[in-house]
Amino acid sequence: MEYPWLQSQVHSFSPTLHFPSFLHPLDDSKSHNINLHHMSLSHSNNTNSNNNNYQEEDRGAVVLEKKLNHNASERDRRRKLNALYSSLRALLPLSDQKRKLSIPMTVARVVKYIPEQKQELQRLSRRKEELLKRISRKTHQEQLRNKAMMDSIDSSSSQRIAANWLTDTEIAVQIATSKWTSVSDMLLRLEENGLNVISVSSSVSSTARIFYTLHLQMRGDCKVRLEELINGMLLGLRQS
């Protein structure tokens, strides 16, 4: 026998079961997607961090290489500068080279010293040219005098002496004689009278005449005159 009213009451009072939230089944697809996204972000962050580290290391290596290259270039530059300063210092006189001059003082001294030496070189060059011209003139004059002396000497004159001033203190003396004679005593007397004998030479002409050429220099204590010198030498030759 059915009781409809009882069934309606049962249905109206049937409890609804509510499970706790931690007992609900998880949505696998949603949870899986969230985990993948989290892992992707974590991997991306790690990759970026590693890339940043590599970039920092590369930048550090580049900076270190630049610093080493700069130091090497600086050492090479200083070595070249020191070599140049040594070359400059070598141009200075020995007295300046021994002094411990600073680099600015060395440069200043060289800048002043080079024009001085240039002027000195020019002066010496002019002096050399003057001396060469004077020597050339003297040589030519001596040749002319020797020729004139040889032409003027005849058989009746056994000795002939000619003297000529070369400078204020130097005298050239030519002696022509018909026989070989010792001039050592004559040279000794010249030394005693304040004359230094610079050189003595001899030659023989085609006429068998003997020629002596003396280059004399007067000292400060020389008291003999040229005429007295010639007469004294002639007297000595005649007595020899």
Curated annotation (Swiss-Prot):
Subunit structure: Homodimer.
GO biological process: cellular response to iron ion starvation; regulation of DNA-templated transcription; regulation of transcription by RNA polymerase II
TM region positions: none
InterPro entries given in the database record: bHLH_dom, HLH_DNA-bd_sf, MASH1/Ascl1a-like
Induction (record text): Up regulated by iron deficiency in roots and leaves, as well as by nickel, high zinc or high copper treatments. Repressed by high iron, low copper and low zinc treatments.
Keywords of the record: DNA-binding, Nucleus, Transcription, Transcription regulation
Domain bHLH: 65-117
Chief place of localization: nucleus
Tissue specificity of this protein: Flowers.
Protein name, as recorded: Transcription factor bHLH101
One of the record's GO molecular function terms: DNA-binding transcription factor activity, RNA polymerase II-specific
Gene name linked to the record: BHLH101
Gene Ontology cellular component terms for the protein in this record: RNA polymerase II transcription regulator complex
Compartments in which it is found: Nucleus
PROSITE patterns in alphabetical order: BHLH
SUPFAM superfamilies named among the record's database cross-references: HLH, helix-loop-helix DNA-binding domain (SSF47459)
The UniProt record lists the keyword Transcription: yes
Species in which this protein is naturally found: Arabidopsis thaliana (Mouse-ear cress)
